Each structure stands twice: as C-alpha cells, then as structure tokens.
Amino acid sequence: MKFDVLILGGGVSGMQCALVLGSGLSKPFAINKKAGIIIHQRASQLQNALFNNVLGLPPGKFGSDILIEGKKQLAALYPEVAQIEKEKVIAVENDKEGYQITTNKNTYFSKTVVIALNYAKPFSIKGLESFVIPHKKANPIKERIQLINKDHLIQKGLYCCGTIAGCRSQFAIAAGSGASVATDILTLWNNGNHTKVHDKKPIF
C-alpha cells in the first residue's frame, strides 16, 4: 500500500498530526493525497495518564480514554485517513520514491513519514539507529532518547514529533508538535505557501 504521508504512532502527537492532516485533505492542493497512521498504542505514555492541566480537556480526564476517543474522532471527521491497527513498525528504510515501512505484518511505501513514537528505550527500528541520541529535555536517569532533527525534520521526507523529537513529556507540547509537523507537510504540498487549517463558527 502506498501513501503520500504515513504517521507512525498513535499517541498525542501522532493523533494530533493525523487530525490536522485529515482536516487539510479537502484543500485543492491535497486532492488525491493519501494519508495514514499506524496506531500501536500499547506503549503510549497516555495509558496511565490523568489530566487536570490541559486547556479544552475536562479535569480528571484519563489518557486511556483519549486514545480511544481520538481514533473515533479521526474516523468520524476524516475517514480518508487510513487507520492501521495492531501492527508494530520494524523498519523505516530509504526507497527510491520515499520510504519503505515494514511492520510485523505488512510492508508500506510513503513519500513522507512522521515518527511519532514515545521516547523510551529500547528503540529498535531498523533504518533509524543513526539518528538516535540521548533526550535533551528529560531526566538523564531515565535514559530517554530522541531523534536528531531540525524543527522536526530529520531529513527530506522524514519528520518526527512529540517526545521522540526532543519535546518534554507534556500533553499540550506533544499535541502542538504534531500539529506543527502536519502544517509543515501541508505547506510543502501547497508549493511552500504557509498553510494552516481553521474551522469557523457558523454565523446565523
């Protein structure tokens, strides 16, 4: 299966990236673009999280509920974004048209890839080993890792977002990181014209 963009990871940053990309697929410059997300949430930091300090979330919100609700929201609003579940990414390797993504079940090809996995060890995805460094904004005792990047870009067509991009483990920061990458990709598709996607309240 071939994609124009494939997101790897279904946590905060990955799902937020998918939602913003999905909202942009109806734009003229994104017509016929194919987007997908490989959702492997079992290792997500959200599983045991409780939120009281996130704008827009009611106090006492469980991270495990957000994981479920995020998938439902993406499917309901932007069904064009393919959700691939119960697959674990094994390799991300250069391909003549972008990247080949290998999971424990399938092989995919994408022009652009977004790494949105968590920052815990071990990180054993083949093809990304040379980009792994100690996390710059985490407690060294925990031995967290990140991928070398400049403003989320690792190299042409390869992005990262959230904690794996070097962000602190904070919900709002991770979400913003994912949204930032999505708008960078939409901008790229829009011939470099800076792009964002806003919905507006209807006026009666």
Regions inferred by a protein language model and the residue ranges of each:
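Extreme N-terminal leader/targeting segments of oxidoreductases
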Residues: 1-4, 66-68, 73, 135-139, ...
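Beta1-alpha1 glycine-rich phosphate/pyrophosphate-binding loop at the start
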Residues: 3, 7, 12-68
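Short hydrophobic core segments
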Residues: 6-8, 107-121, 158
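N-terminal Rossmann-like dinucleotide/flavin-binding domain of flavoprotein oxidoreductases
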Residues: 49-107
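Glycine-rich beta-alpha-beta "Rossmann" dinucleotide-binding loop(s) and their flanking helix/strand
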Residues: 111-143
